[in-house]
Amino acid sequence: MCIRDRGNLDPQRLSKVAADGEWLSGDKPSKEVLFHLALYRNNPRCKAVVHLHSTWSTALSCLQGLDSSNVIRPFTPYVVMRMGNVPLVPYYRPGDKRIAQDLAELAADNQAFLLANHGPVVCGESLQEAANNMEELEETAKLIFILGDRPIRYLTAGEIAELRS
């Protein structure tokens, strides 16, 4: 796997890491490499992981009272079609092994996650799909803040089932 700690995606700066977590070449990998590996190991559809500290999703991850099984109650079809449920992982210090442990438990059934007070993590079957999923998550988080306390028409169970079929 290749991973980038931060900054631009310069191919010369990517870290190459073995499936067991051994650093093979390139820049020193991110301290969060363990949770990337946990997602790859526990979700065969996960071929790419994108983790950001984007404004809207990170702001959402800081709110109290979120449903930890699904932070985003479906109100647009694209959340359902691209991501499904978005579980919340409790706050741990960045790089803490418990992030990887919690994501490993959630990985098989999910492809998008919020790390409490930290930010979003998404998977995809390609880097492009993971980036698209991240964009959808970020824009949906933005909509949540734009809508604020206004009444939202959430999708019904029937509408959600139709989108998943």
Question: Where do the protein language model's features map onto the residues?
Answer:
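Glycine-rich flexible loops
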Residues: 4-165
